[in-house]
Amino acid sequence: MSLLRISKMIGAVRKSITRLPRDKRGVSAVEFALILPFMVTLYLGGTAITQAIMAKRKVVLVAHTVGDLVARDNVITTAERDAIFDAAKAVFAPYPWSPLLKVRFASVEVNAAGTATVKWSEALNWTAQAINSTVALPAGLNTANTSVIWAEVSYDFTPPIGTAFTGGTMTLTDQLYIRPRLVSCIKRDTGTLKGCT
């Protein structure tokens, strides 16, 4: 290789190097490549959090719906129980309810000594509260010779995307304590009446 040719190559490289800081043609592509991972992470994380918030809202709505429907009755029959569970499923739509959605409600009576016990309980995809089991009620609800309807909801939520941001499956829960609206104590009719001692 001749010395003249090497000199021309060095000159061409030097020109390219001096022109490079003034050339703006690839700046947008480089900036986009740097920002893209952050934007994708932000999008997936935001989507996962939004889905979890929406699912939690549905869990709260189901607990309030179930508690309110039970509290508006005086005797819960098997047909009414099934209708309440159907209402819970309808409120929970469009999320899949079986077997991830667990619903439970119970009539809790407080005796003269202030001890709260479960008189009857029903559950969907869950175990019902044990009859005559003692439970702790929140302050203000443990009034002697009264009853309370206790509605509980639990949902195992796994976001369709973004599980890395939520840590996988989250258990969303809510519960509602509500006094009967029409009678002092709501009974459960399973062929024989339960509750209201």
Mark where each language-model region is.
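Short, conserved structural patches
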Residues: 2-3, 64, 68-197
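Alpha-helical assembly-interface signal, strongest on the long, hydrophobic N-terminal helix that forms
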Residues: 2-91
